[in-house]
Amino acid sequence: MLMTDKKGISIKAIVLGVLADVGGSLVVGIAYGIVLAVIMVTKGIRPEEISTHLSVPLILIPCLLIGFGATLLGGFVAGRVAKHSEILHGAIVGALGIPLGFLVCGSFPLWFNIISCAGVLPAGMAGGYLAKPKQVR
């Protein structure tokens, strides 16, 4: 049974897309954080000093890419599950990622938050586009 509202938006697709986005961000983000922590500790940085080293662009840009990749995955999942209006479903997943991102990224630099907000919607839409059947693209 496909759960939809009167406009044809699949709630199931959106929920699964958001779960894929959040889950992907968490899994890859945690792995990235562990690798960074190990590298920093082996370079002699004390564990209590690690957080001060995490706000440099060299560290944060991969975080943006991880987030955009996870949102692309979420948009793809939403589009595939919905089987119609794939780009719209991907856009909704991306749009829902904006407030979720502020909950997680509130302590990051302003430039990071601006780029994150600007890129998350297109990433979700791109995932939805990739979910479209090839003959429809």
Language-model region placement:
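Juxtamembrane/disordered regions of integral membrane proteins
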Residues: L2-R137
